[in-house]
């Protein structure tokens, strides 16, 4: 049996990249999936570690690098063609390199040498990103914290070319952050770029020198990005380095200076007219140009709102013409890229081209795009990956006809932990669900998504019905159980293949059965019951009717206290599903039904038990109703204790329960043979059931097990990420041991490994679901194993044939000499035929059994009536006048509610600007005062509660501290010092309330010890301190000369503090005074010579020694008790202080959550307002573009004057926008920020407010070159302005600011210019960096330069001068500004047409002014948004810190609860068992522990004690073996001595003739005769036994014939009984009909009388109601106000609010203080 990976379903939500023209790669669990988009074929590359952190691909050379997770990660390089490893790198072993000289260590440059080692190894605890160079020879590795290093490898030789830490950000001079992405320059392997948060953006230069290489970074220039923006991602382009910012901007950087690239104005004039005419009259603005059309200064290549919502840019990718920008809001926008040379400039570089929609509903889904890459066969396909597990493919080029481009879904996978995987009941698919709340159906053959159902909450349990019912059940974390109807897998597969909508998973049943998450769901084998168990300790049984489509809860039962169900299985018996078990039984559920008739469900409990639940036949029938209101279910429950808790259980069909296989908490697989006797199920406290067999399975405990449908294979998976395949004897299959281990390590171990495994309905496929959200499908096949064996035999035969051919001719065998074993072939054929016949017979028997059961069920439950009748009754409609009154009251209430909703508040009774009497005002004042008093009283009550609790804790701690002090005093009296760990400082909580005086005394006052700086002391104060010091010294000298204490000690105690009475201490009750004579001797009691003292003194000495020994024993016991009390008191005070700290943290956390909620709501409101402004601005821009496009249509009749009108239409004056409404200072100042810029002849807005930059790229790489180009452009612009003014019209303004070079403080560190793509090849492909043909140029080689730097700069400057001069010459004829339109009317133009043109142009100017005003409003709206976001982020981080502190505190408390120390003192050489003592009644220092804690600790102690006892037993057995071996050796020696003695006796014995005969024959011949007689007797008895056996068989056949005849007679009797039953039923029906005819007349008479009485009562009530209505109408006319009609409400003024003054404000309305202020 072999196991092979079939498909991998999962996407980690991270990096996705192209590996070929039609193949892409992403991470799935602990593997990299290489997926072919066309054929949907997959190749899976398994990681070698615990997980995969990142990977990199080189498409040109077919390389793949994988970085594994771990504290010492390893980077492995593979070939994408063969998936074989090529090299392995260990970044943690790289040592920091020195520069090798002072010249290579400039301050702050971070220069590092790559050839000399001078420091210790680096600390690389993780790898964040990888990148290959374009030539495939170099690999860049970026390490995680704490080093945050960048390492460049020559990976083929495992050589480190350069290593350096990430530079610190400008805001933080010391802290660094790791890079999130890295990439080499596509044409130069010595240049690479990094980007990431916290200043990780830099361009790195690796410059090889003579003996070393300098590796240094160049960071961003100061002010290169807008304030508050950080670089989030980057991408190399032909024009420079594109970077995305955290504020949604796109910036093109010059790699020589790391400043934004300067883009100059492009040609205008006639070229501009042509472009404008082609686009409908709209062209891109050129900043800095005059209104007359002269080309002005340059602008920076910055698009501030590349992501319109202001969200961060998460990914960048590009091709030759376009740049795709992906945002954190899910939007993907495509811009025109900046070309590499002036000859290839597009009309609008960095202008918005179009958008890519990830969904049909709109441009953004709210889910960020995590990764994006452009590739494919033509390098024009965009591949996008999102963190929600989806992957999309879209064309990067714009769609014909304009509009957004739609994407195609490639992959849609789970996100987060999977709850389970089960087979589809119909086969051909697997079902999964997980924490993302979705239920999905996957194909077993290719892993395609066949169906999907999104639910509202995370799902925690999953079960599928047995074959025959297409049902599945899911349980959520909220306790909701749903039953889904599954579509057939074949139908879903055909829909998925034809791109049709996937079939829906219909919800058949939904009900909240549990108050906690659902743990286990399981169907019965007959699909008639569903069991659900949750963490609330409740298990529910539901009746399932698969045929009728109904699910109904039957009842619930409670689990054992404190237990939780870990796994469940419902085994089926060998004889069938138990359909014939007592369905006709009636009455309530009974627990006394015969055991063994109904199938039982086995539940594995967390406490190490097994629970057997047997449902009666009535529950299986589907017609039983629970008679109890609390839905309590009475079923048969049996409990069994196991030796270890089973985390997952699977059963094999058997006679009763079958054999159960489980994955235990001890990381072993167990085989359980469950007892069939009820007495063996003795409960959870009985002796545990030992496993029949157990073997080590996995390295981690949690996981799952599954049994194949045929019951011949067992699969297991665990948290170590491995999947194992075993036979039913728990032996690992040899094919898996010797194979590639397809199921080993495919899941991410750091995420949790394998959650569960499952076979499909056929047993051919195996699936494993992981905590990393990945699903792997494996194929089990014997063909591979047989093929391997056959290949081995073929290779062996080929070797033999080759050896035969190589042998000499005389020794060579011919074909005829090769013998074929014909007998073996015939035997194999016979065996095959026998097996086929046996299988056919078994299948036929199974079919007959199924037909029989179907017929029985059909006869039992069939009902010919498909539709049941029902009784329908209605309610009488009320009279018309009541309807009118009800409509009036409803209308009045709607008016009041509309008024309150319009005002936004519910008033207290007074309305602004209305006149009220003094009494009403006084009442309002009293009401507000009462509310203030209520609020104050509530606050005081809460404050007093908190103060009382704090004071109680402080008193308790003070009592415990006093108790600690007393215990220490007692220990010191006994002369025993306390342990070192119990001498810490005392715990305390300040019970003082924080009043104003206390705050002023503690917070607002600074004590001297709090001042850290040196204090200034004046000379007077210094002299005063010196005098005080001298006085103290004199007093100390006087006290030393005549000390009163010493004098008193000499006079009263004789100069010593020793106790009188021979060393007896009166305060110590355990000290015994020595006898007087012993004190006189002055020796120790043990050193007294008995011969020197009398017998009386000797006896007295022994008595004293005995008393002293007993006192010392009592003293030791007392010390032990005091130390225990000391530990108990310390534990209690620590618990109190930790609880107080936890309460404080919880209070702070609540306040932080409340503040965070307010900040989030305010931020959402601001964002909504900002989105509205952005939509308004976009609409204005669309209106402008529409007017520009419709210009030619509006004035098509102008004929020859159309070009002149178009020129006048585009002309602008600066004062025109300033004079329009809304176009004042805001519009003038904010024009550049909003994207509306003055151009040479027009204004243009691109969609979404992105500025369209009509400019060209500057190729100057030095400050001098850029300045020269700017100077030439300025001169050309000045000349053009002069030419324009000489034409008769006054110039409008200056020519603009000249181009400025890079900042003066930036020094380029690279020694040569970056290479450019080959122009001839770049024009034929969309790849921005195509491969150059051989011999074209050397730009694609790392570190090479085709031209000298001076030559390169000279040519670039010449191109710039030529371009600016041509631009000025082209714009010279269009520099005439417009002051008065009336004098510019073309001759021959119709006056009406001219007036219409003037009005149209005025409308266009108004639209431009409105756009500028909207841009100004947008700038103001965006101003406070970053501050609100930062405040929300700060509150969120504060909440995380508080939650971390609370979690750490609870963890410490839990560790302290387990960290107990028990001192046991035993005498040497023996174990003393102390008699039990009565427990103390004082429970003040007792600690309440949960029963589970004590039981868990007892289990730990019992386990350790058991291990110790087993060691002692093993030692005893080993010694017993030694003694037995010694005894056997001694016995052998004794036998040898006896044998030697016998031999010696035989040698000395006298030899006779008889003796010689015995020695010669060996034994007596009579024994042979006796053996012959016995054999004859045995043969005779065998013949008699065969004869008797034949007689018995004959009698047995006769009895069988009698039994068959009796059965036939019984069948005839049964038929006769059925006939008699039918006759009896007919007689009973006739008698019932005759009796019912007599009763019918009586019932009819009674019904008539009752009907008459009811009519009289109804008439009386109707009259009474009429009188009441008349009285009510009279009262209404006197007292009730006039009602208004619904049609007159809209024109009525707002009536005053008539609400009583005591109505309180609703939640969420303005505060009472604001209402009081308005009052």
From Swiss-Prot:
<feature type="compositionally biased region" description="Low complexity">
    <location>
        <begin position="1257"/>
        <end position="1269"/>
    </location>
</feature>
<dbReference type="GO" id="GO:0031514">
    <property type="term" value="C:motile cilium"/>
</dbReference>
<feature type="coiled-coil region">
    <location>
        <begin position="1524"/>
        <end position="1609"/>
    </location>
</feature>
<feature type="repeat" description="WD 3">
    <location>
        <begin position="226"/>
        <end position="263"/>
    </location>
</feature>
<keyword id="KW-0963">Cytoplasm</keyword>
<feature type="region of interest" description="Disordered">
    <location>
        <begin position="1685"/>
        <end position="1719"/>
    </location>
</feature>
<keyword id="KW-0206">Cytoskeleton</keyword>
<feature type="coiled-coil region">
    <location>
        <begin position="1651"/>
        <end position="1679"/>
    </location>
</feature>
<keyword id="KW-0175">Coiled coil</keyword>
<keyword id="KW-0853">WD repeat</keyword>
<feature type="region of interest" description="Disordered">
    <location>
        <begin position="1220"/>
        <end position="1269"/>
    </location>
</feature>
<feature type="repeat" description="WD 2">
    <location>
        <begin position="174"/>
        <end position="214"/>
    </location>
</feature>
<feature type="repeat" description="WD 1">
    <location>
        <begin position="122"/>
        <end position="165"/>
    </location>
</feature>
<feature type="compositionally biased region" description="Polar residues">
    <location>
        <begin position="1709"/>
        <end position="1719"/>
    </location>
</feature>
<feature type="region of interest" description="Disordered">
    <location>
        <begin position="1277"/>
        <end position="1296"/>
    </location>
</feature>
<dbReference type="InterPro" id="IPR001680">
    <property type="entry name" value="WD40_rpt"/>
</dbReference>
<feature type="compositionally biased region" description="Gly residues">
    <location>
        <begin position="1221"/>
        <end position="1233"/>
    </location>
</feature>
<feature type="repeat" description="WD 8">
    <location>
        <begin position="749"/>
        <end position="788"/>
    </location>
</feature>
<feature type="repeat" description="WD 7">
    <location>
        <begin position="697"/>
        <end position="736"/>
    </location>
</feature>
<dbReference type="InterPro" id="IPR015943">
    <property type="entry name" value="WD40/YVTN_repeat-like_dom_sf"/>
</dbReference>
<keyword id="KW-0969">Cilium</keyword>
<keyword id="KW-0282">Flagellum</keyword>
<feature type="region of interest" description="Disordered">
    <location>
        <begin position="1022"/>
        <end position="1045"/>
    </location>
</feature>
<comment type="function">
    <text>Flagellar protein involved in flagellum axoneme organization and function.</text>
</comment>
<feature type="repeat" description="WD 9">
    <location>
        <begin position="1073"/>
        <end position="1114"/>
    </location>
</feature>
<protein>
    <recommendedName>
        <fullName>Cilia- and flagella-associated protein 43</fullName>
    </recommendedName>
</protein>
<feature type="repeat" description="WD 4">
    <location>
        <begin position="308"/>
        <end position="345"/>
    </location>
</feature>
<feature type="region of interest" description="Disordered">
    <location>
        <begin position="1325"/>
        <end position="1372"/>
    </location>
</feature>
<keyword id="KW-0677">Repeat</keyword>
<dbReference type="InterPro" id="IPR011044">
    <property type="entry name" value="Quino_amine_DH_bsu"/>
</dbReference>
<feature type="region of interest" description="Disordered">
    <location>
        <begin position="94"/>
        <end position="120"/>
    </location>
</feature>
<dbReference type="InterPro" id="IPR036322">
    <property type="entry name" value="WD40_repeat_dom_sf"/>
</dbReference>
<feature type="repeat" description="WD 6">
    <location>
        <begin position="513"/>
        <end position="552"/>
    </location>
</feature>
<comment type="similarity">
    <text>Belongs to the CFAP43 family.</text>
</comment>
<feature type="region of interest" description="Disordered">
    <location>
        <begin position="569"/>
        <end position="596"/>
    </location>
</feature>
<dbReference type="Pfam" id="PF00400">
    <property type="entry name" value="WD40"/>
</dbReference>
<keyword id="KW-0966">Cell projection</keyword>
<feature type="compositionally biased region" description="Low complexity">
    <location>
        <begin position="1344"/>
        <end position="1358"/>
    </location>
</feature>
<feature type="repeat" description="WD 5">
    <location>
        <begin position="413"/>
        <end position="452"/>
    </location>
</feature>
<dbReference type="GO" id="GO:0005930">
    <property type="term" value="C:axoneme"/>
</dbReference>
């Amino acid at each position: 049996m072999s196991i092979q990976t079939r498909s991998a379903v999962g996407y980690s939500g991270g990096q996705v990249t192209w590996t070929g023209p039609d193949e892409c790669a992403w991470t799935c669990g602990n593997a990299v999936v290489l997926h072919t988009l066309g054929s949907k074929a997959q190749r899976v590359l398994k990681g070698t570690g615990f997980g995969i952190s990142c990977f990199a691909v080189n498409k040109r050379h077919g390389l793949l690098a994988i970085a594994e997770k771990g504290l010492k990660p390893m980077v492995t390089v593979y070939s994408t063609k063969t998936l074989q490893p090529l090299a392995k790198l260990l970044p943690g072993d790289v040592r920091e390199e020195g520069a090798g000289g002072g010249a290579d260590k400039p301050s702050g440059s971070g220069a590092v040498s790559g050839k000399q080692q001078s420091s210790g190894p680096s600390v690389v605890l993780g790898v964040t990103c990888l990148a290959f160079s374009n030539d495939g020879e170099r690999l860049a590795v970026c390490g995680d914290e704490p080093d945050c290093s960048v390492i460049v490898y020559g990976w083929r030789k495992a050589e480190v070319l350069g290593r350096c830490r990430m530079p610190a950000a400008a805001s933080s001079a010391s802290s660094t952050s790791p890079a999130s992405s890295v990439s080499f320059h596509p044409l130069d392997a010595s240049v690479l770029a990094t980007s990431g948060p916290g200043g990780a953006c830099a361009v790195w230069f690796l410059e090889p020198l003579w003996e070393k290489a300098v590796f240094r970074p160049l960071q961003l220039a100061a002010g290169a990005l807008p304030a508050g923006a950080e670089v989030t991602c980057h991408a190399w382009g032909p024009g420079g380095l594109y970077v995305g910012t955290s504020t949604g901007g796109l910036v093109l950087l010059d790699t020589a200076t790391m400043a934004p690239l300067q883009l100059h104005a492009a040609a205008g004039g006639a070229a501009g007219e042509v472009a404008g005419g082609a686009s409908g009259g709209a062209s891109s603005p050129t900043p800095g140009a005059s209104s007359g059309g002269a080309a002005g200064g340059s602008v920076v290549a910055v698009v501030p709102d590349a992501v319109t919502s202001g969200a961060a840019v998460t990914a960048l990718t590009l091709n030759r013409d376009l740049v795709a920008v992906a945002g954190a809001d899910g939007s993907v926008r495509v811009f025109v890229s900046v070309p590499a040379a002036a000859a290839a400039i597009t009309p609008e570089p960095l202008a918005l081209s179009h958008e890519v929609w990830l969904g049909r509903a709109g441009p953004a889904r709210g889910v960020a795009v995590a990764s994006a890459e452009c590739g494919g066969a033509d390098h024009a396909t965009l591949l996008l990956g999102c963190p929600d597990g989806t992957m999309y493919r879209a064309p990067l080029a714009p769609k014909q006809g304009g509009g957004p481009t739609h994407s195609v879904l490639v992959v849609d996978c789970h996100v987060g932990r999977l709850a389970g995987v089960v087979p589809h009941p119909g086969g051909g698919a697997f079902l999964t669900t997980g924490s993302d709340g979705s239920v999905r159906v996957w194909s077993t053959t290719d892993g395609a998504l066949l169906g999907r159902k999104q639910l509202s909450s995370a799902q925690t349990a999953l079960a599928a019905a047995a074959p025959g019912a297409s049902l599945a059940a899911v349980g959520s974390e909220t306790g909701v159980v749903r039953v889904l109807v599954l579509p057939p897998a074949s139908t879903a597969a055909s829909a998925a293949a034809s791109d049709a909508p996937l079939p829906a998973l219909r919800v058949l049943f939904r009900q909240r059965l549990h108050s906690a998450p659902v743990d286990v769901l399981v169907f019965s084998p007959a699909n008639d019951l569903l069991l659900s168990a949750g963490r609330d300790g409740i298990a529910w049984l539901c009746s399932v009717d698969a045929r009728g489509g109904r699910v109904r809860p039957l009842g619930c039962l409670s689990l054992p206290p404190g237990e939780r169900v870990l796994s469940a299985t419902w085994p089926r018996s060998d004889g069938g599903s138990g359909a014939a078990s007592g369905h006709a039984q009636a009455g309530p559920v009974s627990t006394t039904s015969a055991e063994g008739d109904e199938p039982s469900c086995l539940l594995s409990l967390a406490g190490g038990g097994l629970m057997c639940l047997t449902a009666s036949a009535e529950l299986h029938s589907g017609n039983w109703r629970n008679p109890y209101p609390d839905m309590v279910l009475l079923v048969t429950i049996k409990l069994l204790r196991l030796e270890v808790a089973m985390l997952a259980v699977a059963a094999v069909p058997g006679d009763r329960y079958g054999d159960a296989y489980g994955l235990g908490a001890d990381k072993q697989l167990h085989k359980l043979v469950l007892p069939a006797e009820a007495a063996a199920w003795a409960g959870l406290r009985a002796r545990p059931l030992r496993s029949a067999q157990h073997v080590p399975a996995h390295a981690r405990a949690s996981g799952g097990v599954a049994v194949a449908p045929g019951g011949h294979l067992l699969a297991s998976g665990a948290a170590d990420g491995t999947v194992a395949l075993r036979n039913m004897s728990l032996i690992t299959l040899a094919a898996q041991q010797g194979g590639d281990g397809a199921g080993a390590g495919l899941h991410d171990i750091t995420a949790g490994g394998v959650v569960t495994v499952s076979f499909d309905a056929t047993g051919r496929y195996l699936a494993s679901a992981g905590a990393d959200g990945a699903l792997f499908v494996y194929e089990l096949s014997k063909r591979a194993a047989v093929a391997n064996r056959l290949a081995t035999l073929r290779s062996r035969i080929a070797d033999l044939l080759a050896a035969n051919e190589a042998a000499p001719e005389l020794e060579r065998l011919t074909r005829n000499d090769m013998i074929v074993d014909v007998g073996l072939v015939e035997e194999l054929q016979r065996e095959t035929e026998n097996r086929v016949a046996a299988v056919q017979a078994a299948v036929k028997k199974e079919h007959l059994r199924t037909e029989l059961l179907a017929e029985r069920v059909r006869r039992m439950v069939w009902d010919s009536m498909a539709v049941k009748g029902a009784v329908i009754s209605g309610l009488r409609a009320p009279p018309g006048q009541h309807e009118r009154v009800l409509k009036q009251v409803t209308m009045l209430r709607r008016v009041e509610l509309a008024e309150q909703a319009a005002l936004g508040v519910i008033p207290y009774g007074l309305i602004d600007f209305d006149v009220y009497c003094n009494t009403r005002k006084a009442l309002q004042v009293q009401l507000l005062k009462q509310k203030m008093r209520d609020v104050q009283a509530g606050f005081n009550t809460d404050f007093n509660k908190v103060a009382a609790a704090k004071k109680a804790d402080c008193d308790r701690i003070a009592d415990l501290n006093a108790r600690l002090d007393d215990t220490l005093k007692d220990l010191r009296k006994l002369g025993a010092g306390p342990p070192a760990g119990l001498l810490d400082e005392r715990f305390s909580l300040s019970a003082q309330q924080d009043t104003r005086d206390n705050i002023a005394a503690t917070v607002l006052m600074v004590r001297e010890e709090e001042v850290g700086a040196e204090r200034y002391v004046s000379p007077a104060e210094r002299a005063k301190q010196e005098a005080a010091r001298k006085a103290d010294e004199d007093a100390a000298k006087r006290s030393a000369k005549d000390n009163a204490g010493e004098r008193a000690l000499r006079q009263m105690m004789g100069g010593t503090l020793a106790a009188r009475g021979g060393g007896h201490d009166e305060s110590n009750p355990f000290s015994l005074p020595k006898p007087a004579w012993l004190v006189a001797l002055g020796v120790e009691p043990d050193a007294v010579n008995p011969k020197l003292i009398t017998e009386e003194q000797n006896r007295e000495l022994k008595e004293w020694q005995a008393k002293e020994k007993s006192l010392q024993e009592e003293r030791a016991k007392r010390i032990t008790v005091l130390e225990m009390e000391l530990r108990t008191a310390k534990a209690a005070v620590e618990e109190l202080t930790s609880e107080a700290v936890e309460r404080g943290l919880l209070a702070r956390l609540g306040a932080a959550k409340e503040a965070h909620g307010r900040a989030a709501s305010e931020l959402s409101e601001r964002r909504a307002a900002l989105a509205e402004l952005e939509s308004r601005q976009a609409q204005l821009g669309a209106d402008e573009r529409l007017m520009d496009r419709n210009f030619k249509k509006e004035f098509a009749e102008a004929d020859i004057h159309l070009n002149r009108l178009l020129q006048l239409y585009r002309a602008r004056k600066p004062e025109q926008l300033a004079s329009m409404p809304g176009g004042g200072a805001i519009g003038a100042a904010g024009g550049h920020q909003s994207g509306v810029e003055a151009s040479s002849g027009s204004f243009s807005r691109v969609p979404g407010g992105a500025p369209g930059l009509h400019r060209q790229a500057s190729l100057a790489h030095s400050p001098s070159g850029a300045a020269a180009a700017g100077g030439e452009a300025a001169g050309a612009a000045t000349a053009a302005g002069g030419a324009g003014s000489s034409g008769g019209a006054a110039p409008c303004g200056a020519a603009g600011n000249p181009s400025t070079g890079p900042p003066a403080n930036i020094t380029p560190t690279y020694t040569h210019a970056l290479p450019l793509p080959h122009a001839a090849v770049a024009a034929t492909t969309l790849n921005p960096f195509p491969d150059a043909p051989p011999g074209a140029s050397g730009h694609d080689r790392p570190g090479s330069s085709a031209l000298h730097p001076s030559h390169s700069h000279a040519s670039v400057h010449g191109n710039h001068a030529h371009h600016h001069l041509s631009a000025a010459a082209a714009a010279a004829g269009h520099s005439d500004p417009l002051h008065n339109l009336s004098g510019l009317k073309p001759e021959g133009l119709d006056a009406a047409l001219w007036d219409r043109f003037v009005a149209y142009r005025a409308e266009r100017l108004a639209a431009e002014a409105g756009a500028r005003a909207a841009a100004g409003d947008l700038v103001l709206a965006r101003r406070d948004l970053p501050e609100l976001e930062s405040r929300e982020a700060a509150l969120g981080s504060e909440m995380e810190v508080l939650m971390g502190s609370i979690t750490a505190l609870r963890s410490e408390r839990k560790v302290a609860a387990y960290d107990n120390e028990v001192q046991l003192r035993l005498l040497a050489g023996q174990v003393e068992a102390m008699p039990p003592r009565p427990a103390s009644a004082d429970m003040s220092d007792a600690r309440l522990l949960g029963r589970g804690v004590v039981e868990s600790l007892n289990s730990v102690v019992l386990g350790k004690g058991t291990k110790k006892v087993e060691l002692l037993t093993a030692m005893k057995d080993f010694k017993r073996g030694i003694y037995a071996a010694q005894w056997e050796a001694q016995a052998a020696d004794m036998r040898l001595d006896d044998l030697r003695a016998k031999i010696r006796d035989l040698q000395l014995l006298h030899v006779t003739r008889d003796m010689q005969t015995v020695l010669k024959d060996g034994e007596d011949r009579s024994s042979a005769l006796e053996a012959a007689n016995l054999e004859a007797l045995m043969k005779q008895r065998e013949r008699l036994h065969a004869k008797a056996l034949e007689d018995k068989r004959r009698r047995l056949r006769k009895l069988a014939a009698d039994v068959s005849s009796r059965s036939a007679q019984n069948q005839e009797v049964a038929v006769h009984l059925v006939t008699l039953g039918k006759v009896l039923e007919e007689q009973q029906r006739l008698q019932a009909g005759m009796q019912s005819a007599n009763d019918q007349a009586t019932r009819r008479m009674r019904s008539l009388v009752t009907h008459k009485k009811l009519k009289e009562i109804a008439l009386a009530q109707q009259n009474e109601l009429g009188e009441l209505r008349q009285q009510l109408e009279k009262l209404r006319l006197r007292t009730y106000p006039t009602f208004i009609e619904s049609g007159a409400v809209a024109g009525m003024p707002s009536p005053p609010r008539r609400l009583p003054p005591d109505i309180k404000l609703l939640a969420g309305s303005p505060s009472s203080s604001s209402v009081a202020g308005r009052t």
